[in-house]
Amino acid sequence: MPTLVAWSAQRSFQRGSLGAAASGWSTRSGSAYSTVGSAAATWAGEWWTLGGGGTVWDSMSYDPDLDLLYIGVGNGSPWNRRIRSAGQGDNLFLASIVALDPDTGDYVWHYQTSPGESWDHTATQQITVADLTIDGAVRRVVMQSPKNGFFYVLDAGTGELISAEPITELSWATHVDMATGRPVETPEARYEETGQPFASRHNPNGVHTWHSMSYSPETGLVYIPAMESTFPYVADPNFEISPVAFNSAVDFGALAAEVRP
């Protein structure tokens, strides 16, 4: 008899920060089945003292045809990578779509939408599985429009990047390099490194957040509830970890009034 597993996003508060995992339990016995921590060895400094982030707080999708579970991983904590990870590393698996074997919890593939993110960029948004005709061939794909403003189409079985296009005007990146799969960041986007305010064309809520998007096989279109807004990202020069604070290491009291997006 096949094992039935109930999967759940899981998060825990760690000194004002969030740590996360995806966990499974047998639906028959209730016993823990497997756990996958949403972190890897692409970090620097003593990031574990702050938790690191990586919450799986919203989207998970299951494809019965491929027998894969897709989880969307959240932002880093603190947001400011200079504080979180000594300004270094991609910080896997933050801001990533991760495919897992649902029977074992084993890693299959991942795609990171915002490597080394510093802007509260989550990839927890809805993950839609569909069959699309691309270049004359039907392909099984996953689609996501995460906070960072790009719309991604990936091969559902391998994670291969098929397309990545912005759905609105962005200021943190110009485009996604299709050869590397990485966003090409603008010089001013790394506010934590430049020491200057960065006027983002979207705020920490993102261009698209937890509001559902829809795909119509009849029209071949995806419908996304998108937002346009601005936000001044400024590194907090006086940041100290607190058990009762948001701990973003971003100065929410600052106003970059002289900086135009």
Language model segments and positions:
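Beta-sheet-rich non-transmembrane sensory/scaffold domains
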Residues: 1-261
